[in-house]
Amino acid sequence: MEQKLKVGILGATGMVGQRFISLLENHPWFEVVTVAASPRSAGKTYEEAVGDRWKMDTPMPEAVKKLVVLNVNDVEHVASTVDFVFSAVDMSKDEIKAIEEAYAKTETPVVSNNSAHRWTPDVPMVVPEINADHFEVIKDQKKRLGTTRGFIAVKPNCSIQSYAPCLAAWKEFGPKELVVTTYQGISGAGKTFKDWPEMVGNIIPFIGGEEEKSEQEPLRVLGKVENGQIVKAELPKITCQCVRVPVLNGHTAAVFINFEKKPTKEQLIEKLVAFKGFPQEAELPSAPKQFIQYLEEDNRPQVTEDVNYERGMGVSIGRLREDTMFDYKFIGLSHNTVRGAAGGAVLCAEALTAKGYIAAK
């Protein structure tokens, strides 16, 4: 790419916005030129607006420190400065729906980390390794919006990243039923231990809205395109409990699974480690070389050892074994703010760029 695409971050001061800025530092295709946030941050430099709330392990990139924060509601102005935007705004669902459509209608593609449009029939919800073919509904979405280049694409919830890829890898065996419990790090709530001290040594057995997303969203990712819309898959049936645990980054899933055609353990592992998709074939900049790793040790995957596998863009699976009530059980782990949030959205944007949906204005 001769000239980098100009990128704006909507909701740039929050945790996911910060992760976008951190991941996009020195990106070969994209350059952050605009940061937008709430009216109270507007007019300040990015450094001033974030203040002591920078939550990343790496320092704030020099290139963004002096960018003046724009008001995210000033849609025309923000859109005029960029080729496309990443959305991580913190608003009500209806407000997010409206503002993302408003940006799309300025002919600015929107790649969103938010849940507001995940069930809009002509908005693709994509894990690029699994369902990059769903991008084809964008042409129908553009007709609805009356745009030529503006559209919305979203990524699914962070909680499903540690088991949904397995379902795609094992498709030929017909995953039929899943019982899942997720153990989710506190960064998923936009927090650190500094600002959520009551999570130290604690477990909270409820995360609002998360169980429904964890049960339903994999079916949309595994669905198919029909008549310009995405029709969700019928199977597998999924039941899920989601638990907040005292870990900073990383979502772990304990999964029990039944298949229509029960495979051997060796077949399952072989399919996992061989699984690849469009990002690997196209050698996208953020793509993990090996999307899924299988760990043989009994005590893996562990957050401290494995959450940053493939720079946080890969998925780690372990403890696959036969079960007395189900066919198999296993443990999965993914990085919730990299693969599960900003990193997954960056990979989506790379896939959209490689396929010609995003280009310079």
Predicted regions mapped to residue ranges:
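Charged docking surfaces used in two-component/phosphorelay signaling
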Residues: S187-K361
